[in-house]
Design a protein with these regions (language model features):
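Structured beta-strand/loop patches that form or line metal/cofactor-binding pockets in enzymes
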Residues: 1-56, 333
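N-terminal amphipathic alpha-helix/helix-capping segment at the start of soluble metabolic enzymes
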Residues: 1-14, 35, 106, 114, ...
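Metal- or metallocofactor-binding catalytic centers and their adjacent structured scaffolds
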Residues: 2, 38-39, 43-116
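Glycine-rich beta-alpha junction loops
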Residues: 39, 51, 292-294, 320
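Active-site-facing alpha/beta catalytic cores
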Residues: 96-222
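Short glycine/serine/threonine/alanine-rich loop segments
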Residues: 118, 284, 310
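Catalytic core of soluble alpha/beta enzymes
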Residues: 168-305, 314-315, 322-331
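C-terminal extensions of enzymes
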Residues: 322-350
């Protein structure tokens, strides 16, 4: 599929960086950076979703230090990025490295399409469809069902992706099962050195796998203790954090039935579209994931979900679902198709 966009012409005259921030909760202020590429009277937008505030501040302070101006194709621009130092000082965590690359690549895709006067779906030959979404959340420490109840009171049909922790006891699990609103459990077993790390816990894994027989089980840490617990449930095991390329899919401990794709993890448009092609050939299901985007990055992942996996439990809810408390009048699932007339954008009329 990449060959359908690789040769798009791309004229870049300048670029700007725009800082975004939002207090998700009293304890967490999210910061991102919008990349705006400009050329021929058009603008292409991408978003760096790196979680480290220091990395974001460093990026923004560098200004226009990356030499991007010139005439390119989308593919030659990607090759240029291979040679440029997008992280002069290196990221706080190595997993963040592709996030900045994706900001420039998605902005370039948007700009090239706008300069061509065409939307993404038209160029790659896919039809946007209504997007099913879930709301992703953690339940605090100690864990409580109250966040789920609060959102269900406001939106009774809302469905969830939840992050189990070792403080989930039988009573909490029973209460969550009774909601019948959980689609995915993210065990966070692939994270190291982050605030959301969850150690391999065979007791927790057994508890949730048995209690939720029909949900996806994402990113378990498979060890001598946990692998036997989850072996009967392998058809429901999915992977997110380890997936950056087709080679990562090949490297999984067993063939997956379904995967979670976060475009920013792939870094390049080519790596993402090659992975979509591979999963289509191998009949591997996909659902989309988000990175608490604050800008156009969120609507871009909604656009991709509408094209490649609209009916799956996509973790691409509108941005307001990332807040601690629900607000009235939020869009509900499924989201109606809303591609822009040109570019890699969603929810805009132009």
């Amino acid at each position: 599929m990449y060959d359908r966009v690789a040769d798009l012409s791309l004229e870049i005259e300048s670029y700007d960086l725009e800082p975004l921030e939002h207090a998700v909760s009293p304890e967490f202020k999210r910061r991102t950076t919008v990349v705006r590429l400009r050329g021929e009277g058009h603008e292409g937008i991408g978003e760096d979703v790196t979680y480290s505030p220091e990395d974001q501040e460093g990026f923004q302070s560098e200004g226009h230090s990356v030499p991007l101006a010139g005439s390119h194709s989308l593919d030659s621009f990607s090759q240029l990025l291979d040679r440029l130092a997008l992280w002069p000082a290196g990221p706080a965590i190595e997993q963040f490295r592709p996030y900045r690359r994706w900001a420039f690549e998605s902005a370039a895709l948007d700009l090239a399409l706008r300069q061509a006067g065409a939307p993404l779906h038209e160029v790659i030959g896919l039809q946007p469809l209504p997007v099913t979404f879930v709301s992703s959340m953690r339940l605090g420490e100690p864990a409580s069902i109250e966040p789920v109840k609060r959102w269900l009171d406001a939106f009774p049909k809302l469905r969830f992706k939840l992050d189990p922790t070792s403080t989930w006891d039988d009573a909490l699990v029973t209460s969550l099962v009774e909601t019948r609103a959980v689609d995915t459990l993210d065990l966070k077993g692939a994270y190291k050195g982050t605030p959301v790390d969850q150690e391999a816990d065979p007791t927790l894994y057994a508890r949730v796998a048995m209690a939720f027989p029909n949900v996806w089980i994402e990113d378990p840490a498979l060890t001598e203790e946990t692998d036997p617990v989850l072996e009967p449930h392998r058809a429901r095991i999915t992977w997110d954090a380890p997936i950056h390329s087709v080679s990562d899919i090949h490297g999984l401990p067993f063939p997956p039935r379904t995967l979670n794709f976060k475009p920013s993890r792939f870094g390049s448009v080519r790596a993402l579209l090659d992975a979509y092609d591979y999963c289509g050939e191998q009949r591997i299901g996909i659902y989309g994931g988000g990175q608490n985007e604050l800008g156009q990055g969120r609507s871009q992942i909604q656009y991709l979900a509408s094209l490649f996996h609209p009916d799956m439990p996509n973790d691409v809810a509108p941005k307001a679902y990332n807040n601690a408390d629900p607000a009235p009048g939020l869009p509900t699932s499924p989201l109606a198709p809303a591609p822009s007339k040109t570019g890699f954008r969603w929810g805009e009329t132009s």
